[in-house]
């Protein structure tokens, strides 16, 4: 484990990184399709130069998705969509073992939650991944200066999709979003 990093991050405990890495690798062994995609992305680098801000559950499954995007050339900043589901060891491993900026601590309060979203947005994203539409909402309310950089995003939850559809109906949504919850692959 690397004990120092120049990456911007806010995690609970760097000493948890080794345990987090073990759990991420275990999850990876049960995600063979994602592993194949990562191999292809390592060769083709489809996300070279792309900055992604992701607001998702910080779990071993999400960690493997972030690793795939990084293998594809993306620069990533991940924050927690739900502080109560944050796995602190996973967050530590993403920072110290895999070089991904993470802003997440299990049990963080409301102010910390929104500070983490803003910290992830400081990457000046081209794409966003959201779970509940809080990141996209902040982009469209208090971080509007970043909107010209964002070309697209995806939303994982039904609640987030409802919020996005209302934003689109009101003419407030400034970039296209994929409703992951509506895709056939989510319901296989």
Give, region by region, the residue ranges found by the protein language model.
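Histidine-anchored nucleotide/phosphate-binding helix
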Residues: 59-73
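Glycine-/proline-rich flexible loop or hinge segments
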Residues: 45-51, 70-76
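Short, glycine-rich nucleotide/cofactor-binding loops
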Residues: 51-60
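Glycine/serine-rich phosphate-binding loop and adjoining beta1-alpha1 elements at the start
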Residues: 2-47, 78-188
């Amino acid at each position: 484990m690397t004990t120092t990093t120049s990456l911007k991050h806010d995690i609970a405990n760097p000493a948890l990184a080794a345990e987090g890495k073990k759990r991420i690798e275990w999850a990876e062994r049960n995600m063979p399709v994602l592993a194949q995609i990562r191999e292809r992305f390592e060769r083709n680098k489809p996300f070279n130069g792309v900055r992604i801000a992701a607001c998702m559950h910080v779990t071993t499954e999400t960690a493997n998705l972030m690793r795939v995007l990084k293998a594809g050339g993306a620069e990533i900043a991940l924050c927690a969509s739900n502080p109560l589901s944050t796995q602190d060891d996973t967050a530590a491993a993403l920072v110290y073992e895999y070089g991904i900026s993470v802003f997440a601590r299990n049990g963080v309060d409301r102010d910390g939650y929104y500070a983490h979203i803003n910290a992830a947005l400081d990457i000046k994203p081209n794409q966003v991944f959201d779970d509940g539409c809080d990141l996209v909402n902040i982009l469209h309310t208090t971080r509007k200066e970043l909107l010209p950089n964002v070309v697209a995003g995806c939303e994982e939850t039904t609640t987030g999709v409802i919020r996005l559809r209302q934003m689109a109906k009101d003419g407030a949504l400034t970039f296209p979003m994929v409703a992951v919850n509506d895709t056939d692959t989510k319901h296989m």
